[in-house]
Amino acid sequence: VGLYAAFIVGLVTSVTGGRPGMISGATGALAVVMVVLVKEHGIEYLFLTVILMGIIQMAVGALKQGRLIRMVPYPVMLGFVNGLAIVIFLAQFESFKVEGANGSKSWLPSSDLAIMLGLIGITMAVIYLIPKLTTKFPSALAGILVVSGIVIFGGINTTSVGDLSSISGGLPSFGIPDVPMNMETLMIILPHAFILAAIGLIESLLTVSLIDGITETKGQNNRECLSQGAANILTGFFGGMGGCAMIGQSMINMKSGARWRLSGALAALLLLAYILFASSLIERIPIAALVGVMFVVVIGTFSWSSLRIIRKVPVADAFVMILVSAVTVATDLAIAVI
């Protein structure tokens, strides 16, 4: 359901959304809410909830309420960005662990850890070196290709994408959620739909604002609300979990020089192509290469200037910035902003 959502939401929002270059798909912040619903009522209720979530988001766009995100104060934005960077950084530590026979996780053996750290270092070095040589080839892709080549042709034993999960599958098919269409069902899904719609729009519109700052252009918030809503309605009918803007992936896209709709649409289409035809190749990519890419994203996302000015700004602003960062790390991005 996550891969289908990544394809459908990614394609629809890249073509019709209000922020060219932004990448959307299934996200962890939405999944946290969805897990509770699925455990209690089943996957079919999730699909109907995603459809209702999309309707709510489209209503926000139609009523032109997307502008409310511009009321978020600058210290909150700084705290959000720094908290995001910390969340991405901490999330990578799971890749340094291995699951034992009893299901518990422990750190990799020292030899495996050294290999992984070395590969991460090579990935990061390539990413920083490539822009000095050429700007016509995405540095993140170059890093992944170089390290994948080293691992595959060097016969290095390290964790790959395929060791964690399979990404192969087929085309999504249209279907009406198999749940009773009555008031009881509505009372079950309505609270979840409102929460998911709020989280999705907050993350998406904050990402729009973030990219606005990077590109020094202005996105269309109401159009993004309409696009996110339409994408979620569609993915609900095709058995997807819904989605919103993916901040980390959007930052990678921006750092790679993408500025137009083609990048997002191509990413979604390539994801589907990989699922259908090239899953075996993707599964051979070392996890270390992906971790290296994300570490570079962390370095580029964190507002290092905020550390220099924190003693110069009003105490209230500094407190808000630190609080938002802390809540972002402890809970999720949407709750921190609220």
Predicted region positions:
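Transmembrane helical cores of multi-pass ion-transport proteins
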Residues: V1-I338
